[in-house]
């Protein structure tokens, strides 16, 4: 059962990696300038609206396209916030259910197929009763993939954005000093680490994502426009504050430690009571 779960988790991680690679592959799909007359569903309904919104906010801030990208990034994060809140609540519920799941695993510890199937059914029933979706954690990431590709094309196909400068770099080119990619990787790690804090050991089997994602972001940031690295940095900072406000992992960790201590104390008292009972029985027999 554990091996099967590990395989599924590795498969999920591989799928996410392949998905990001697919995003990279798609980045060069079209280089035609984007306008309101651009044809095709992707260009007309995804890339052009992103380009238009970035340009509109940039004009609002005196033609500063970096500020436009920052504002649009925050707006996108606000739009997907309901999903992120649901994800955080699902993570918290999953963590609180771990003792019950452990009990089920001990109850159905046999290796035969019938028992394994029963364990799966009981686990799914437990999830349904508590409105928990184990796959919910992947949904926000999957939604952000097309947004990332749309952002890339909006930048590379809009001359005003592509040629605008921010600090020491041109938004359409990679950061020549690798500062933004490094900051993007560090904030990705911080965001992922904070999200994973307070989770149980079983959930931590997915913790390799915490280390894989920053490395991927670093390499992507080195080769892709600096505007994308800026998008990642702002998005990661937003996620950190969002997690701390909605589902504070430090508070959750303290609660879990207190619960674990209470459970240990309860077990200690039960053992003490059982030992005292056994001692009394032994004393009566000797009499």
From Swiss-Prot:
Location(s), subcellular: Cell membrane
Pfam families, alphabetized: 60KD_IMP
Principal location: membrane
Cited CDD domains: 5TM_YidC_Alb3
Signal peptide: 1-26
Lipid linkage positions (N-palmitoyl cysteine): 27
Top-level taxon of origin: Bacteria
Chain segments annotated as transmembrane: 65-85, 135-155, 178-198, 207-224, 228-250
GO biological-process terms attached to the record: protein insertion into membrane; protein transport
PROSITE patterns linked: PROKAR_LIPOPROTEIN (PS51257)
Gene Ontology CC annotations of this record: plasma membrane
Alphabetical list of InterPro entries matching this protein: YidC/ALB3/OXA1/COX18, YidC/Oxa/ALB_C, YidC/YidC1/YidC2_Firmicutes, YidC_ALB_C
Alphabetic keyword roster: Cell membrane, Chaperone, Lipoprotein, Membrane, Palmitate, Protein transport, Signal, Transmembrane, Transmembrane helix, Transport
Keyword set includes Transport: yes
NCBIfam families reported for this sequence: yidC_oxa1_cterm
Family: Belongs to the OXA1/ALB3/YidC family. Type 2 subfamily.
Name of the protein in its database record: Membrane protein insertase YidC 2
């Amino acid at each position: 059962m554990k091996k099967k779960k590990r395989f599924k988790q590795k498969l999920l991680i591989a799928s996410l990696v392949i998905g990001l690679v697919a995003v990279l592959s798609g980045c060069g799909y079209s280089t035609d300038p984007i306008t309101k007359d651009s044809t095709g569903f992707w260009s007309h309904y995804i890339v052009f609206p992103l380009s238009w919104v970035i340009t509109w906010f940039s004009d609002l801030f005196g033609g500063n396209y970096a500020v436009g990208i920052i504002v649009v990034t925050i707006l996108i994060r606000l739009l997907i916030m309901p999903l992120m809140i649901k994800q955080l609540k699902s993570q918290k519920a999953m963590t609180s259910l771990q003792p019950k799941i452990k009990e089920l695993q001990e109850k159905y510890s046999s290796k035969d197929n019938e028992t394994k199937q029963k364990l799966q059914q009981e686990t799914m029933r437990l999830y349904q009763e508590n409105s928990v979706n184990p796959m919910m954690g992947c949904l926000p990431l999957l939604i952000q993939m097309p947004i990332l590709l749309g952002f890339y094309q909006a930048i590379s196909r809009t001359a005003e954005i592509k040629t605008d400068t921010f600090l020491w770099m041109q938004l359409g080119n990679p950061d020549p000093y690798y500062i933004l990619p490094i900051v993007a990787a560090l904030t990705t790690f911080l965001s992922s680490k904070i999200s994973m804090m307070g989770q149980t050991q079983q959930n931590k089997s997915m913790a390799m994502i915490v280390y894989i994602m920053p490395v991927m972001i670093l390499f992507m940031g080195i080769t892709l426009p600096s505007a994308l690295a800026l998008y990642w940095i702002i998005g990661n900072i937003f996620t950190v504050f969002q997690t701390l406000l909605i589902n504070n992992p430090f508070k959750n960790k303290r609660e879990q430690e207190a619960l674990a201590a209470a459970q240990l104390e309860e077990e200690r008292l039960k053992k003490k009571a059982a030992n005292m009972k056994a001692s009394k029985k032994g004393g009566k027999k000797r009499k």
